């Protein structure tokens, strides 16, 4: 009996569990994908039960097994255009709540450090986008007014500068967390807040920290390769 109990406990520690509730999700299908450096690998799906769901990713899953104990990125899809991304390590149990209308803008997560930090980044970006959209609406209504347009452009650049400062502070405050990669690559309207060429030293420092914490992570190896490619350019 003791051996059975220990085996069961060991299995729980090496699995990732993601549970939660999606408001107004009904009985829709929810898909789960592992985000790899080669793209998305769908590993499970379930029908919501009055919005509730549960995924248990076993350590026996080949994609999970080969990733040792480094954080893994997962993406939950209600549809191709409505999803949220999160991170988890083996042994973690994430609890997620969200509204079906927009998973990324409304979700809250607990149970994992990387997951919580990713949510903070998503929430900060949502605030930025909301403010940027307000400025754009005013801009559109005053296309012919050069003075107002110039003022809006100044306010927008202050907004961009402020969010970039937030990301810089985030990276400095969490140097050993994989969520720093998410912060570095955060973007709005196809514009990154960090430029790969001008801010390469930031990515190099993240890589240096991550290499110590998770030397075998495919994400880390890919980021190191990206730096090498940029530095090898003539």
PLM segments and residue spans:
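N-proximal helix/coil linker or "cap" segments that precede and/or mark the start of modular domains
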Residues: 202-234
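Helix-turn-helix repeat elements of alpha-solenoid scaffolds
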Residues: 157-164, 196-204
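Extracytoplasmic electrostatic interaction patches
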Residues: 86-91, 186-194, 203-210
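Hydrophobic core/packing positions within alpha-helical solenoid repeats
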Residues: 156, 184-187, 227
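A non-transmembrane, solvent-exposed segment enriched in polar/low-complexity residues
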Residues: 9-158, 162-165
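Structural signature of alpha-solenoid helical repeat scaffolds
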Residues: 171, 175, 195-198, 215
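Sec-dependent bacterial lipoprotein signal peptides
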Residues: 1-7
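Amphipathic alpha-helical repeat scaffolds of TPR domains
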Residues: 175-190
């Amino acid at each position: 009996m003791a051996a059975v109990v220990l085996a069961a406990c060991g299995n729980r520690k090496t699995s990732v569990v993601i549970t939660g509730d999606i408001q107004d999700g009904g009985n829709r299908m929810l898909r789960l994908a592992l985000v790899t450096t080669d793209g998305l690998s769908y590993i499970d799906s379930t029908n919501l039960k009055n919005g509730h769901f549960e995924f248990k990713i076993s350590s026996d899953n080949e994609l999970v097994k080969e990733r040792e104990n480094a954080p893994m990125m997962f993406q939950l899809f209600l549809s191709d255009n409505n999803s949220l991304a999160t991170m988890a390590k083996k042994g973690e149990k994430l609890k997620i709540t969200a509204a079906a209308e927009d998973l990324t803008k409304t979700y809250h997560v607990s149970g994992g450090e990387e997951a919580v930090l990713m949510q903070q980044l998503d929430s900060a970006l949502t605030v930025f986008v909301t403010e940027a959209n307000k400025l754009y609406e005013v801009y559109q209504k005053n296309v012919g007014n050069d003075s107002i347009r110039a003022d809006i452009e100044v306010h927008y650049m202050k907004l961009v500068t402020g969010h970039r400062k937030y990301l810089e502070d985030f990276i400095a405050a969490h140097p050993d967390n994989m969520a720093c990669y998410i912060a570095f690559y955060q973007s709005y309207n196809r514009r990154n807040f960090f430029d790969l060429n001008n801010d390469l030293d930031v990515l190099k420092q993240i890589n240096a920290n991550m290499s110590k914490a998770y030397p075998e992570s495919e994400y880390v190896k890919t980021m190191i390769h990206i730096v090498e490619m940029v530095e090898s350019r003539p």
